[in-house]
Amino acid sequence: MSSSRPFALALAALSLSLLCVCPPAGAACAGASAPVAAGRSVYLEDLTWMELRDAVRAGKTTAIIPIGGTEQSGPAIVLGKHNARVRWLSGRIAQELGTALVAPVVAYVPEGSTEPPSSHMRFPGTLTVPPAVFDATLTSIADSLRIHGFRTIVFLGDHGGYQKDVARLAHRLNRRWAPGTRVLAPPEYFQASFEGFAQILRERGYRADELGTHAGLLDTSLSLAVDPALVRADLLHAKGVRFDTAHGVYHGDPRRATAALGRLGVDEIVRKTVAAIRAREQR
């Protein structure tokens, strides 16, 4: 064999591989146009780019952007509560919708100032970003999903502090991207997780001073239902553990929290949010 032949074969192989480099968005990749089997996961980060491409082509054109937050939640709930909860609930909602995929969780949100520390920033482990950074991050994520073919983009926020900010952002993006892309920030998600779930618990005899607004019975039960590892259950009844404002629990008492109660909240959140998204998609 000629000494130049191995080099020629290698060059040909390299040229063929370069045909599969992606052209600008919207054009098909040469050598990669054949459909691949779609992954079963609704989470974008679990898919290959080709699985995602084919899922969008097959009609999964709704993208959910779950927004959490890394903050203190009293002595017994982990710092990543909001992130774990919104990811899991978004997955349930996407499965119910049947046409949705879930983007990675936005775990960094405004949590107060750093100098001096305010709000949850007074507790070690809480992470904060300025509102402008939060706004720009959400805008960039939504824009990325838009250019990849998603036509409905849904912000779901698990934390009460930024609900109005996200609603204003959705309104602004709708004005910019209509009619090709619709951006939703359904308030039903947070309303169901707070007011709706609280009403369910009150009807079952639980007191308002147990439910709380942060890290109380309501918050703890939801976390137990999503993943028991989010809660240090042994601390709920340990002697000497204080569940008060000074220790990050606001107006509540988590000691009677259970996963069974939390599942009532989960069902309420999923049902109300799915109905809200479907209603807005039909407008």
Task: Please place each PLM-identified region on the residue numbering.
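Residue-level detector of alpha-helical hydrophobic segments embedded in or interacting with membranes
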Residues: 1, 18-19, 30, 61
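Compositionally biased, low-structure terminal segments
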Residues: 8, 22-23, 30, 191
